[in-house]
Every structure is written in structure tokens, then in C-alpha cells.
């Protein structure tokens, strides 16, 4: 794992999760042909040295939503999306799943107090709880993150467009959610 602006705490959490992390910054020399793929964060720019190296080596480059979908493809995907209230609904779902003693994976953008981290992907769980996001996927792919998840169960909280979103108009914002709801 690599990135610019990583704190010592983040690096420690990555190490504790079993990830190799060389520290704060970009390390294109660490990308070698033995690495299967590169997962591209939404804020990575097109001229990023690791991205350029991955392209040079012909590596599979995936956005975070693509990676999550591929890792949860055979699971029942429950996606909670919307402008506000996702964390509360996810917290209630975590409580219900645990009470029923159901194993589940999760990929969240918000910190949920009852979970040790924001991502847990396993081979055993048959359910994946995903926090959906309506933002642009990456510098290479201008589709919206919600377009990738293909939920079996979709839960929408309130929808509230603002000028700070990646959508130029309220109509474009609602269109993203309409596409998501029929995926």
C-alpha cells in the first residue's frame, strides 16, 4: 500500500492488517511484474509515478469500487447509499447481522464504532455490506462509484444535491441514483 499524506497511525494500521507499506509517498520502483494488480484511489492523479509504472508494466489497474465488486462478486451485496444517514443505517445492520450470528464482509467509507476498521473481506462470508458513494471513481474512469456495486439489496437514505458534489446539476445527481437503483 502506498499514498501521499499517510500518517504513522495509518501506516501502523496497514502493517497490522498484513499490508506491506513502505511509508508516506510513492514508490514506483516497488512495482514489479509479480504484482497482480494495482488498486487506484479516487484522488490519484493521471501523472502519478506509480500509476505510470503500472501502465508501463501492463498491470491490471482497478478502481476501489471495481476491486470491491470483484472481491464480493459471489456474495449477496447490500449497498447503503445516499447523502446522509448511511452510517446510522449501517450501524443498525451490523447489530442485526451480529445478533443473527451471520458472518459478513464490509467496505465502508465511514468509521462505524462497532467495527474494528473500514474494510473486511474474507472468503467465508456470504454477505457483503457496502457503503455506496456517488463520487467519481478515479482519474482514469469518470464513472460514479455507485455504478460498480450491482447490489442485490439497495438501501437509499435521503438524497440531497449540493454544489460540492461531482454532479453539475440536481438532475444529474438524481440520475446517478436512478441508474444505481435499477442496477
Show the residue positions of the predicted features.
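Conserved SAM-binding strand-loop segment of SAM-dependent methyltransferases
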Residues: 19-24
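Structural motif
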Residues: 2-4, 40-43
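Short, contiguous pre-domain boundary segments
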Residues: 36-37
